[in-house]
Amino acid sequence: MKKITTINSGVIPLMRDNIDTDQIIPKQFLKNILKSGYGRNLFYDWRYKATSKEANPDFILNKPEYKQAQILVTGENFGCGSSREHAVWALKDYGFQVVIAGSYSDIFYMNSTKNGLLAIELPKKDRTILASIPAKEKIIVDLPRQQVRYEKYQFDFSINPLWKHKFINGLDDIAITMNYAKKIEAYEKEIPNFN
């Protein structure tokens, strides 16, 4: 997992509530078991015209000024719907490192933490300020300080200390377990052999 400490990036405002996993990555694109290749189909039904499959120039991800943004600012209940880890893979593959929402589906939130996508919760008033920032401007997400900053604004957020440790150190669940390899081996030697 890639380390995340401080992200300095523009934001993509997509201030809609109840964006579900099928809107994030539609079911017809779930045939792959790899974690890559999903970014091109992120928000597919909004990014492309239904009749011609051409890019919809009005959708924010298709606007050139937002192409390099790594932070998505969105509404309440993000990632609701079916349990679909592919939704997180699509966001990561597109280039997002951080999603700032009012709330998340529990399963989506856990999938995010396990796949290196930092999911931050902020109240609507704070997200409204962030969503209004011009495309060329950048904000700072400072994980060690648990802050989102832009000019005179500073928004504090909470995160589970273990997840914070995992993000800052680039550790996934397997890497955390491997930190205890010697203790696990010692314990296994103490267990009676029933053969």
Swiss-Prot record:
Q: What is its EC number?
A: 4.2.1.33
Assigned keywords, A-Z: Amino-acid biosynthesis, Branched-chain amino acid biosynthesis, Leucine biosynthesis, Lyase
Q: Does the keyword Transferase apply?
A: no
SUPFAM superfamilies noted in UniProt:
LeuD/IlvD-like (SSF52016)
Q: This protein's superkingdom? A: Bacteria
Q: What Gene3D superfamilies would the database entry show?
A: Aconitase, domain 4
Annotated signal sequence is none
According to UniProt, this protein's pathway is: Amino-acid biosynthesis; L-leucine biosynthesis; L-leucine from 3-methyl-2-oxobutanoate: step 2/4
Q: Does the keyword Membrane apply?
A: no
State the Gene Ontology BP annotations.
L-leucine biosynthetic process
- One Gene Ontology term, aspect cellular component: 3-isopropylmalate dehydratase complex
Q: A single Gene Ontology molecular function, please? A: 3-isopropylmalate dehydratase activity
Q: Write down the chemical reaction(s) this protein catalyses.
A: (2R,3S)-3-isopropylmalate = (2S)-2-isopropylmalate
Q: Which PANTHER family match?
A: 3-ISOPROPYLMALATE DEHYDRATASE SMALL SUBUNIT (PTHR43345:SF5), 3-ISOPROPYLMALATE DEHYDRATASE SMALL SUBUNIT 2-RELATED-RELATED (PTHR43345)
**Protein family according to the UniProt entry:** Belongs to the LeuD family. LeuD type 1 subfamily.
Q: What function does the entry list?
A: Catalyzes the isomerization between 2-isopropylmalate and 3-isopropylmalate, via the formation of 2-isopropylmaleate.
Q: How does it assemble?
A: Heterodimer of LeuC and LeuD.
Q: What name goes with this protein? A: 3-isopropylmalate dehydratase small subunit
From which source organism is this entry? Oenococcus oeni (strain ATCC BAA-331 / PSU-1)
